[in-house]
Amino acid sequence: MTATAQQLEYLKNSIKSIQDYPKPGILFRDVTSLLEDPKAYALSIELLVERYKNAGITKVVGTEARGFLFGAPVALEMGVGFVPVRKPRKLPRETIAESYELEYGTDQLEIHVDAIKPGDKVLVVDDLLATGGTIEATVKLIRRLGGEVTDAAFIINLFDLGGEQRLEKQGITSYSLVPFPGH
């Protein structure tokens, strides 16, 4: 099933916009309101699965924390493993880490060293693409373990914040269901 304009509009309307959150001047796109609507949540998973089910994906990686909410059901429906990428010291087995820049400083993500095997074809899933820093760090982790990443899928793309272009420079095609301006 290819997404229809009506389906995509339904998804867009299920996402609430919160003015001045988390600080004045920010218009926050709240994907948790989509999760509250079982029809919208199921549709978002269905559309992502439909797009990637014949792409030879062997693992789906989701970034903490909302990436888990979309990545795990996509992996389950596709019959492939799900791999969480988490903040430091949240994974119990041996990990590798990658730092990335935030607006005011740096942060770090980790992945289990045995979660991705050389040659795995990996789809990265997250709730939202903004500047692309989190996904870029996630892709670096996967590639360090020998995985191949060509695509990243999102529910929301804040299209004017440069995330798509940043990922393109890394050879990653981004796909999103709902575009919103970031400013």
From Swiss-Prot:
Protein name: Adenine phosphoribosyltransferase
Places the protein is found: Cytoplasm
Listed InterPro entries: Ade_phspho_trans, Adenine_PRTase, PRibTrfase_dom, PRTase-like
Signal peptide (from-to): none
Coiled-coil boundaries: none
Pfam families: Pribosyltran
Record-level GO BP terms: adenine salvage; AMP salvage; purine ribonucleoside salvage
